[in-house]
Amino acid sequence: MSDILFFSFVSDEAIKRERLKAKELRKSRWWQEKCASGICHYCGKKVGKENLTMDHVVPLVRGGTSTKNNLVPVCKECNNKKKYLLPMEWEEYLKNI
């Protein structure tokens, strides 16, 4: 995973705007309900809602947005491993570990 290189054509300003949107969504009832089960979207582990983070399925640096259909609750371990990977790259990574 660490040897994957890509160039981001998303501006720093656009990423900053999307991060602000994500921050607002974290405060929403919608997000609280998404996290209520305490289960990671990727690995399925029950880690508790306080240990879930917000992940952009399509990362911001890859053109993703902070919209409800692109945000999932994940454990910190999965979020740290996934980083900037697209869904199919993440699935490939999981197959190879």
State the predicted function of each range.
Residues K49-E50, K81-Y84:
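Short, non-ligating residues that shape and space the ligands of small metal-coordination modules
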Residues G63-K81:
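Short beta-strand-alpha-helix junction that forms the catalytic/metal-binding core
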Residues T53-P59:
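Histidine-centered catalytic micro-motifs used for acid/base chemistry in nuclease
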Residues Y42-C43, E77:
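Short, cysteine/histidine-rich loop/knuckle motifs that typically chelate Zn2+
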Residues G38, L52, P73:
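Cys/His-enriched microdomains
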Residues S2-Y42:
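Short, charged surface segments at domain edges that flank catalytic/cofactor-binding sites
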